[in-house]
Amino acid sequence: MEPPQRKQNPLETAPIGRLIRRYSIPTALTLMVNYLYNIVDQIFVGQGVGVTGMAATNVAFPLTIVTIALALMIGDGCAANMSLCLGRRQQEEADRTASHTVTLLVAAGVFLAVAGSLFARQIVLLFGATETAFQASLDYTRIIVWGLPFLLFSSALTAIIRADGNPKYTMKCMILGAVINTVLDPVFIFGLHMGVVGAAIATVIGQVAAGGLCLVYLRRLQSVRIRRAWLRPTAALTGRIFKLGIPSFLTQIMTAAVQVTMNNLMTRYGAQTAYGGDVALSVYGMVMKVYQIAHAMFVGVSSATQPINGYNFGAKRYDRVRATYRMAATIALVVSVGWFAVYQLFPRAIGTLFVSGDPVYLDACQHIFRVYMLAFFLYGIHMATSSFFQGIGRPVQALAIPLVRQAVVLIPLALLLSQAFGFNGALLAAPIADVVSFLLSLALVLREFRRWKKQGWLS
């Protein structure tokens, strides 16, 4: 009697374009909604409180980025290891990975809330608060830290739920949180006159709703099971999860480091321009939040390819892995060019959404957008390439790309060029870093495919 045929996984057989579309759209929308919490706060605070209130939300924003960085390290690392294990038919190891992740998330969430509460004053000073915005920044930060564990749960569990084959569920969770936040913001800010405190409370309530709904899904997992016996983490598996997730973590954590560095440079060198330190800080923070919407699209495409690449690499379908990368890189390039056009053509219109009727603020919007985003049309390629290496279990190459862009090029150049050219020098570091990371990405991926051909993996 012939053995029963194994049911084929869609990751191995379905059209690549359909798979990327299925996984990327919910993922991108999920991340967009995460960032929209802060953008909605900024819009309502800008209209209801003004530039000082906007500066306060900008100062606290790196906390959100750090939280999402931890979430992506744990969630993406778990999802990548799960996909590799499932591709190799290692079901028990996939179950262990998912179970470990729950414990890691709880521990990280408790740490974020407690540390954020205890060191709120130091965090606000480190993140570049001006003297006039200090108290508002502190009030806002002391509240939002209690929503960070739920932001962590929702951001990390989306990767696991996506790898489980249900990306639409994550989108529903995030939309619920965003709707709650958007409804409560005007009530607390305008109706109850609570200012930035009201914005923070609305954000936390929305994050609790979204994170709670994601936690409920753990009982509905299809491809893996959470087992109580495997909740206690082991060093080996935890290290493997972190190893696979560290590129996602560093991409986000370096984004936070860039923003903290630039916040301080905007405060210092912006004060020497006609814009002033508070306006420069507020506008830069707004630009970074709008940038995060574009960034979410790239993460959506990149994250969508991770389970495809991981499963097919584990199944030795190397032609399919290469085809997936090519399609992801093409999509990323098109999206990059589109956002570049928006940033260059409509900077004042974007600024008007946040603060209207202030010509100095709008002049700063136009200048910062056009200089800081000068090479943004190249941006998406480095993210698609880093995700490709992460998906096939090569974290060193995946890590090198974001590390070089931000830690080796952008931050040092911003510090050096600002000393030589002031305000504009700090802004010019970003387009230079985009060009360098684009060239590095091409070099690494071409070398990888040449290696595959030499080993006979590609037809």
Q: What positions do the PLM features span?
A:
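Helix-terminus/linker motif at the lipid-water interface of multi-pass membrane proteins
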Residues: 36-54, 124-131, 187-194, 253-287, ...
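Residue-level signal for short hydrophobic patches within transmembrane helices
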Residues: 17-36, 40, 63-70, 146, ...
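Hydrophobic transmembrane alpha-helices of multi-pass small-molecule transporters
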Residues: 66, 181-185, 211-215, 293-296, ...
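Small-residue-rich hydrophobic transmembrane alpha-helices
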Residues: 54-114, 151-170, 263, 283-341, ...
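Transmembrane helical elements of multi-pass membrane transporters/channels
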Residues: 22-41, 143, 177, 206-210, ...
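Short alpha-helical transmembrane segments in multi-pass integral membrane proteins
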Residues: 1-27, 82-149, 191-246, 309-375, ...
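Small-residue hotspots at the loop-to-helix junctions and early N-terminal turns
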Residues: 51-62, 137, 141, 200, ...
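Short runs within selected transmembrane alpha-helices of multi-pass transporters and secretion channels
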Residues: 75, 144-162, 170-178, 199-214, ...
